Protein backbone atom coordinates (compact mmCIF):
# COMPACT_ATOMS: atom_id res chain seq x y z
CA UNK A 1 0.00 0.00 0.00
CA UNK A 2 1.10 3.56 -0.74
CA UNK A 3 -0.30 6.27 1.47
CA UNK A 4 0.46 9.98 1.26
CA UNK A 5 -1.19 12.34 3.74
CA UNK A 6 -1.04 16.12 3.69
CA UNK A 7 2.09 16.25 1.51
CA UNK A 8 3.26 19.83 1.05
CA UNK A 9 6.24 21.22 -0.84
CA UNK A 10 7.21 24.82 -1.51
CA UNK A 11 10.24 25.63 -3.61
CA UNK A 12 12.27 28.79 -2.84
CA UNK A 13 10.16 29.72 0.22
CA UNK A 14 10.21 33.36 1.24
CA UNK A 15 11.70 34.52 -2.04
CA UNK A 16 10.21 36.25 -5.06
CA UNK A 17 10.44 32.86 -6.81
CA UNK A 18 8.39 31.03 -4.17
CA UNK A 19 6.34 28.23 -5.74
CA UNK A 20 3.82 26.25 -3.72
CA UNK A 21 3.98 23.03 -5.71
CA UNK A 22 2.11 20.61 -3.42
CA UNK A 23 -0.65 21.82 -1.14
CA UNK A 24 -1.64 19.00 1.18
CA UNK A 25 -1.88 16.13 -1.30
CA UNK A 26 -3.56 12.94 -0.06
CA UNK A 27 -3.44 9.60 -1.87
CA UNK A 28 -4.07 6.00 -0.84
CA UNK A 29 -3.35 3.09 -3.18
CA UNK A 30 -3.94 -0.48 -2.06
CA UNK A 31 -1.84 -3.41 -3.26
CA UNK A 32 -2.84 -4.22 -6.83
CA UNK A 33 -4.29 -0.76 -7.55
CA UNK A 34 -3.35 0.95 -10.80
CA UNK A 35 -3.37 4.74 -10.95
CA UNK A 36 -2.71 7.36 -13.58
CA UNK A 37 -1.62 10.86 -12.58
CA UNK A 38 -3.16 13.41 -14.92
CA UNK A 39 -2.93 17.19 -14.91
CA UNK A 40 -1.92 20.23 -16.90
CA UNK A 41 1.63 21.54 -17.14
CA UNK A 42 2.82 22.80 -13.78
CA UNK A 43 0.08 21.02 -11.83
CA UNK A 44 2.61 19.15 -9.67
CA UNK A 45 2.44 15.62 -11.11
CA UNK A 46 6.19 15.08 -11.39
CA UNK A 47 6.78 16.98 -8.16
CA UNK A 48 4.44 14.62 -6.30
CA UNK A 49 6.05 11.50 -7.78
CA UNK A 50 9.53 12.90 -7.03
CA UNK A 51 8.41 13.61 -3.45
CA UNK A 52 7.33 9.99 -3.08
CA UNK A 53 10.66 8.80 -4.50
CA UNK A 54 12.60 11.08 -2.12
CA UNK A 55 14.26 13.30 -4.72
CA UNK A 56 13.83 16.18 -2.27
CA UNK A 57 12.47 16.49 1.29
CA UNK A 58 8.82 17.38 1.75
CA UNK A 59 7.88 20.34 3.94
CA UNK A 60 5.15 18.48 5.81
CA UNK A 61 2.94 15.43 5.61
CA UNK A 62 3.77 11.74 5.55
CA UNK A 63 4.49 9.11 2.92
CA UNK A 64 4.16 5.41 3.76
CA UNK A 65 4.82 2.29 1.71
CA UNK A 66 3.54 -0.99 3.09
CA UNK A 67 3.02 0.64 6.48
CA UNK A 68 6.62 1.92 6.65
CA UNK A 69 6.99 5.68 7.01
CA UNK A 70 9.52 6.70 4.35
CA UNK A 71 8.93 10.46 4.66
CA UNK A 72 12.42 11.17 6.00
CA UNK A 73 14.31 8.37 4.25
CA UNK A 74 16.94 9.40 1.70
CA UNK A 75 16.25 8.49 -1.92
CA UNK A 76 18.73 5.61 -2.03
CA UNK A 77 17.05 3.89 0.94
CA UNK A 78 13.59 4.30 -0.57
CA UNK A 79 14.81 2.28 -3.57
CA UNK A 80 14.01 -0.92 -1.67
CA UNK A 81 10.35 0.13 -1.52
CA UNK A 82 9.84 2.03 -4.79
CA UNK A 83 10.58 1.36 -8.44
CA UNK A 84 10.34 4.05 -11.11
CA UNK A 85 9.98 4.11 -14.86
CA UNK A 86 11.20 7.43 -16.20
CA UNK A 87 9.58 9.20 -19.15
CA UNK A 88 13.02 9.73 -20.63
CA UNK A 89 14.59 6.36 -21.58
CA UNK A 90 18.04 7.90 -21.06
CA UNK A 91 17.32 8.08 -17.32
CA UNK A 92 17.15 4.95 -15.23
CA UNK A 93 20.11 3.29 -16.95
CA UNK A 94 23.82 3.96 -17.25
CA UNK A 95 24.57 4.40 -20.95
CA UNK A 96 28.30 3.79 -20.62
CA UNK A 97 27.74 0.42 -18.95
CA UNK A 98 26.82 -2.89 -20.58
CA UNK A 99 23.30 -4.33 -20.46
CA UNK A 100 24.50 -7.03 -18.06
CA UNK A 101 26.16 -4.46 -15.78
CA UNK A 102 22.99 -2.34 -15.67
CA UNK A 103 20.90 -5.38 -14.76
CA UNK A 104 23.42 -6.50 -12.11
CA UNK A 105 23.38 -3.05 -10.54
CA UNK A 106 19.57 -2.90 -10.63
CA UNK A 107 19.31 -6.34 -9.01
CA UNK A 108 21.21 -4.95 -6.02
CA UNK A 109 18.91 -1.98 -5.45
CA UNK A 110 18.76 -1.03 -1.80
CA UNK A 111 22.00 -2.88 -1.03
CA UNK A 112 25.48 -1.49 -0.55
CA UNK A 113 27.44 -1.71 -3.78
CA UNK A 114 31.14 -2.33 -4.16
CA UNK A 115 33.30 -1.21 -7.03
CA UNK A 116 32.39 -4.14 -9.30
CA UNK A 117 29.16 -4.42 -11.27
CA UNK A 118 29.89 -7.97 -12.42
CA UNK A 119 27.34 -10.71 -11.98
CA UNK A 120 27.64 -14.40 -11.17
CA UNK A 121 27.12 -16.93 -14.00
CA UNK A 122 23.72 -18.01 -12.64
CA UNK A 123 22.65 -14.37 -12.41
CA UNK A 124 23.82 -13.75 -15.99
CA UNK A 125 21.70 -16.69 -17.14
CA UNK A 126 18.68 -15.29 -15.27
CA UNK A 127 19.19 -11.91 -16.98
CA UNK A 128 19.46 -13.67 -20.35
CA UNK A 129 16.14 -15.48 -19.74
CA UNK A 130 14.43 -12.25 -18.67
CA UNK A 131 15.66 -10.43 -21.77
CA UNK A 132 14.63 -13.30 -24.04
CA UNK A 133 11.01 -12.80 -22.91
CA UNK A 134 11.12 -9.29 -24.38
CA UNK A 135 11.70 -10.79 -27.85
CA UNK A 136 14.08 -7.99 -28.86
CA UNK A 137 17.25 -10.07 -29.23
CA UNK A 138 18.85 -8.31 -26.27
CA UNK A 139 19.76 -11.62 -24.65
CA UNK A 140 22.42 -11.96 -27.37
CA UNK A 141 23.74 -8.44 -26.71
CA UNK A 142 24.46 -8.61 -22.98
CA UNK A 143 27.87 -6.99 -23.48
CA UNK A 144 26.50 -4.10 -25.57
CA UNK A 145 26.57 -0.69 -23.95
CA UNK A 146 23.07 0.51 -23.08
CA UNK A 147 23.82 3.88 -24.70
CA UNK A 148 23.86 2.13 -28.09
CA UNK A 149 20.31 0.80 -27.73
CA UNK A 150 17.22 2.43 -29.16
CA UNK A 151 15.01 4.41 -26.80
CA UNK A 152 12.47 1.58 -26.64
CA UNK A 153 15.11 -1.07 -26.00
CA UNK A 154 16.67 1.07 -23.30
CA UNK A 155 13.28 1.63 -21.66
CA UNK A 156 12.71 -2.13 -21.53
CA UNK A 157 16.12 -2.69 -19.90
CA UNK A 158 15.28 0.01 -17.35
CA UNK A 159 11.96 -1.62 -16.47
Regions found by a protein language model. Give the residues of each.
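Hydrophobic anchor residue at the start of the ABC signature
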Residues: 159
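Conserved ABC nucleotide-binding domain
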Residues: 130-148
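Conserved ABC transporter NBD signature motif
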Residues: 61-69
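The feature captures the beta-strand-to-loop junction immediately N-terminal to the Walker
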Residues: 38-40
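A short, flexible loop at the N-terminus of ABC-type nucleotide-binding domains that lies
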Residues: 1-4, 10-24, 36, 74
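ABC ATPase NBD coupling module
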Residues: 15, 19, 57, 69-83, ...
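Helix-to-loop junction immediately C-terminal to a conserved catalytic motif
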Residues: 53
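Q-loop/switch helix immediately C-terminal to the Walker
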Residues: 88, 96-112
Amino acid sequence: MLKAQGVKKTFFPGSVNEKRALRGVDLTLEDGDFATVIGSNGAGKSTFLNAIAGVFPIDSGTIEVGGVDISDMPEYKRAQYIGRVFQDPMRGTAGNMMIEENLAMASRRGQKLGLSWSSKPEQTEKFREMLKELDLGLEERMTAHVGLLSGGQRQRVAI
